[in-house]
Amino acid sequence: MALQSNGQIKISDIKTELGSTDNSLEALSNDAGFTAPHAMSDFYGYSAGASNLYYWNFGENDGGASFTGNAGTSPGPFSFSLWIKPSWAASDTNVLLFEINANNGNNTDRLMLIYDYGFNRLVFRYRAGSSNHHLNWALNQNAASGNIGRWHGSSRGPVNSDGFAHIAGTFDPTQTSAANGLKLYWNGTAFNTTITQANGTRANFAKTHMYINVAFNGNGDRNAEYDNIAFWFNRLLTSSQISTLYNSGAPITAGDAGLATGLGFEAAAEGTSLVDDTGNWTNVSAGGSRSTY
């Protein structure tokens, strides 16, 4: 339910709309995705449940998207959330849904989520130097992903009415065991069966380059649609907050979910180009185009 468009708005009204217990206007404004100077009038007509109108459509081998920025060197805590509709062919191999790295060109210092088509698994990995810290989840062994045999345009698993799945994850680098520190969710439901893990170092590295929807071997990208790609570089989301982002299948921004605090990157595809709405990262290139739901 949207807030009123004129007249007096109360802090209590804003708290109810955001589902927040905070009494600070600045904190509430940040959670809604507004910037300074913070004013009550920013909330005229605001709705925490506003749905998106557009998504980003990548064609096969049109380059994916790349950004430059600076998320510091700390390994975390780190959280991500994105919506994806795979349209790649059943013959494709590996897809990097995202990668954040130090741009050193030697396959080290990378934070990533990979879909390995050959083994039908999602791999959430923090790679510091040549040391991997990761978990692998087989899609055919997890009810959250519908136990699908392969993930592609004709086998998407559980999706919303537009064919999109919500994928989210968290990384707690204070945990030496990857099984304790890495979590993955599909449509707000946690994966509970892992197949392999590596408990490598969680050392610092610079996080200055970001890639969305690129082939793991560097040969272009995959045919897929994305929306609301968000990263928190110093915040560990709870399972309840991830459920809020899932929003019963309706993509919303982090601000609409009341989770803008600590947000380091968000591309919601509502503009004419794929840009970081937080202003922290600069778009270097983006293949594909905006499409209407």
Residue ranges and their predicted role:
Residues N204-D227, L236, S248:
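Extracellular glycan-interaction patches encoded by glycine-rich segments
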Residues E99-D109, K183-F191, A250-I252:
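Short edge-strand/loop segments of extracellular domains
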Residues N52-Y54, N228-Y293:
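Extended recognition patches within non-cytosolic domains
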Residues R127-H166:
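Short, aromatic/His-centered strand-loop micro-motif at the edge of beta-sheets
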Residues A2-L53, Q241-S248, L259-G264, G271:
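N-terminal low-complexity, intrinsically disordered "leader/linker" segments enriched in small/polar
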Residues W186-H209:
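Short, solvent-exposed beta-strand-to-loop segments that form ligand-recognition rims
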Residues N57-N132, Q175-A179, F216, F233-I242:
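Extracellular glycan-recognition modules
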Residues G163-L182:
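Localized edge beta-strand/strand-to-loop motifs within extracellular or lumenal beta-rich domains
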